[in-house]
A protein has these predicted regions:
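Intrinsically disordered, low-complexity, charged/polar segments
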Residues: 38-72
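Short beta-strand-centered aromatic/proline hotspots
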Residues: 18-32
Length: 72
């Protein structure tokens, strides 16, 4: 699965521990922030940053999150 910044995904397990709640999120590049967290996850229903990861690979390999669909 090839994800990039700007990818829109349907995921479960990100905001709550429940795998019943599906969230639509976008991966946002935060490299200019200067922190070690370059990958921000934006919840598209609330337009809030809901998670920080060091990289897209870190997001993909997170055991709690399941990617259901890559929309764009």
């Amino acid at each position: 699965m090839k994800l990039r910044y700007g990818s829109i995904l349907k995921v479960v397990g990100l905001i709550s521990d429940s795998y019943e709640e599906v969230d639509t999120v976008m991966l946002v590049n935060n490299i200019t922030d200067g922190s070690k967290y370059n990958c921000k996850v934006l919840d598209l229903s609330t337009y809030e940053i809901v998670a920080d990861f060091e990289s897209i690979e870190d997001f993909i390999t997170n055991k709690q999150i399941k990617i259901l669909e890559v929309i764009a």
